[in-house]
Amino acid sequence: MNILNLIDVVNIIKSEKIIFVTGVTGQDGSHMVEYLLNNTNYFIVGGVRRLSTYNTVNFKNLINHPKKDRFLLTNFDLNDASCINCIVKELKPDYFINFAAQTFVGSSWDFSTYTWECNTTGVVHILEAIRQHNPTCRFYNAGSSEEYGNVEYVPQDEKHPLKPRSPYGASKAAARHIVKVYRESYNLYAIQGLLYNHEGTRRGEEFVTRKITKGVARIKKSLIEGKPFNSIELGNVYAKRDWSDAEDFVDAIWRMLNQEKYRIDFDSHMQIQEYVVSSNETHTIKEFVEMAFAAAGIKGGWHGNGTSEEYSISVADAMKYDPINSVLVKINPKFY
């Protein structure tokens, strides 16, 4: 898909209703675009960073979409206040959905300033542009369970205090406070959902779930072809996570942006609310490993302790495939 300049986008859309979505090349943004095309009649404009090349793999489902012509791309940069001002002023979107961010907890320690600029200051740029040029625009910013940090009780709810323990979590928690300030001070429809882990086929391979599923697929292929394979290397397999389906989450986000339609208890005098979105169930990474291999028809078992623990192919499957390497998963301390 071509990235259009803002003037061309304005000329194409004219007076149509618009939803502006950032982070559209990622998992959540691409699912959001597809959801909106399927469920609304809005023109969808996606914001992408000014790069000579960008990843379009998550757009493959849109190639033959009957409403693909109602999805356009234009340049966007969270750290460029003038760019954001122009977009909000010229397009006057009805909704502004922000998934753009520095999203990696580990990287936030090495790039704390950049993380803050993207995840907090960038949100201020958007809110200020909306306040000045399009105050009826509804704004959603993606939050994270990392905002909770050191939790006080389980399960966490909307009233749980925010005690982030990483620069990433702190940047998202600060953004939440900024969103609240603008909502209450300027009467904006501005919210930040608090999202737990949500997965899917568009999840980046740097996340543990995709690392596991891609690894399982690679190992299965190697077993069938009788070729050697590298074990999947993981950190603490006893860590628990709350995982959900990313497609369910974009539906929840749309409902948060339209509470008068979806809240039975809603009336015009009520404050809009921010919500935690989760499955309310936790599972260990170990369980995820077992289920992923089971889905691929590979049986295995755990043995060893601590960093010496391994998940190896079962005797029955070893006889079936006669693998060169029997260790499917091993622990690497660097991933703790």
What are these model-derived regions, one by one?
Residues 197, 201-204, 238-241:
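Heptad-repeat alpha-helical coiled-coil signaling segments
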Residues 154, 205-213:
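A glycine/serine/threonine-rich, flexible loop-to-helix segment
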